[in-house]
Amino acid sequence: MSPWGGVSDLLPSKDDLNISEEGTTILFANSKGGVGKSTLALIASLGVATRYPEALVQLVDLDKQSTSSDALNNFANSRFEVVNAKKMLLDSGLPNNANISKHINAFKQDNQGRRFLVFDSPAGTEPLRSSFILKCDFIFVPLSVGDADIHATHKFLDEMQELFHYEGIPKDLCPKIIVLPNMIDTRSDFDVIRRNFIEYQIYLGRGLFFLNSIRRAFRRQGTDTNLHVIFEQSKDYWMWLTDLISGKESLPGTPDKLLQL
């Protein structure tokens, strides 16, 4: 039995995946710490594994502190792998782009069924030093409404565009960038984020409102009780996010300015 088996009652499994035979590569990233990258990456990965039990989901932790891998080791099984990516990092802690790219290529070339590769990146991620980003299908950028979060996210997105321009990647072939308003208190918080990114040619995802249960998501307790509470309290959000990752919900065409989903 899956260690998170009870969650499937809330996030029903699906067999109608609409994804590339090469699999899907997802990155949760922002240069700012404390915006919820790891938590969203972990819960989204488990959500995909729960809804699509025939697929392989691999979560790669790019943090030297092993935040994600330590939290999720007790959830790992034959279809949900948690990888500590020490071999994918340089001694400085920066990403080893060559090794990460090799891992992505090998994962995509593996023809053992449907696959999702999820990267959880640490605070301080610099796009101009992270060329492996170009191999991702989706880049989810979590942030809250604070001024520091918004300023850091502006810088992060600007560097992302510099990377695309430097590498000469056509606009329609760039990874899809989706900003995720996270742990917001009111609709006005969401509107503040929307106004601050209105000129960016990216997508604005749904907002996740503040939940105390998120803070307890991965406390060691031997069961999936905390996850069950999270999925119950915010089911629509996780259904939307996993549908987007799986390809069940497709994105509109490349936006000319901020496009709200």
Predicted region positions:
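NTP-binding/hydrolysis catalytic cores, primarily Walker-type P-loop NTPases
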Residues: 221-261
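Structural beta-sheet core signal
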Residues: 58-59, 141, 178-181
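Inter-motif core of Ras-like GTPase G domains
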Residues: 128-148
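Beta-strand-loop-alpha "switch" segments that mediate conformational coupling across diverse proteins
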Residues: 183-226
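Conserved C-terminal guanine-recognition region of P-loop GTPase G domains, centered on the G4
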Residues: 153-171, 182
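P-loop/Walker-type NTP enzyme "switch/lid" segment
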Residues: 20-35, 42, 46-119, 123, ...
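Extreme N-terminal, non-catalytic leader segments
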Residues: 1-29
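Conserved ATPase-coupling elements of RecA-like P-loop NTPase cores
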Residues: 70, 125-132, 150-153
